[in-house]
């Protein structure tokens, strides 16, 4: 069995301003730094076997302390990145609505099929995340004992992982709320996934 601990990175300055930061870096805020300490304390008694993040500094910074505490190397996975917002990286939806009204209208109309200029659609991001999480599960699967895998990633990525593991599609993507520094836990046995914790933040 695999116990999958999914952590959304701690609060960033861009998060506070409502700015889209898919593939660009955004610094952890002062509040986020406190969240990191609380995440580390909460997970200190967990038996963690592997730690994965994305190349984004906000994910690596979030779990650096717990990784060192557990004497584990962080393994970066490019495919677990947030959706690429392309030309709209660093902007707010309000800015997009005002400066690019036609594109904003197209975004609303096309929904999950909408592809950001020079970026991705939700479906694009779902496909790469689904393939990567399947590979991670296959690499770490063991019939003999339970392995605990920690992944620190992004809200969109975590939604993609959950909807993929419970339904095999992206259709429930928007049904899950994923807060900054939240912990979601899934147990996967024989290809069947059960949600043990969902968007858990009581420790913060």
Q: What role is predicted for each listed range?
A:
Residues 196-204:
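Short, solvent-exposed aromatic-acidic interface loops
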Residues 103-124:
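Short glycine/proline- and acidic residue-enriched helix-loop micro-motifs
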């Amino acid at each position: 069995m695999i116990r999958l601990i999914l952590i959304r990175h701690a609060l960033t300055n861009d998060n506070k301003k409502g700015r889209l930061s898919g593939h660009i870096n955004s610094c952890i805020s002062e509040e986020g730094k406190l969240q990191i300490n609380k995440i580390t304390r909460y997970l200190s008694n967990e038996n963690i076997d592997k730690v994965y993040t994305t190349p984004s500094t906000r994910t690596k910074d979030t779990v650096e302390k717990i990784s060192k505490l557990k004497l584990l190397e962080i393994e970066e996975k490019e495919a677990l990145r947030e959706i690429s917002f392309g030309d709209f990286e660093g902007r707010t939806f309000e800015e997009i609505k005002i400066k690019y009204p036609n594109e904003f209208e197209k975004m609303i109309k096309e929904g999950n099929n909408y592809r950001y200029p020079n970026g991705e659609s939700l479906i694009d991001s779902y496909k790469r995340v689904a393939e990567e999480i399947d590979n991670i599960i296959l690499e770490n699967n063991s019939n003999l004992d339970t392995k605990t895998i920690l992944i620190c990633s992004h809200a969109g990525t975590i939604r993609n992982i959950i909807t993929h593991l419970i339904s095999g599609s992206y259709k429930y993507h928007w049904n899950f709320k994923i807060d900054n520094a939240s912990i979601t836990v899934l147990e996967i046995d024989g290809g069947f996934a059960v949600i043990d914790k969902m968007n858990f933040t009581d420790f913060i």
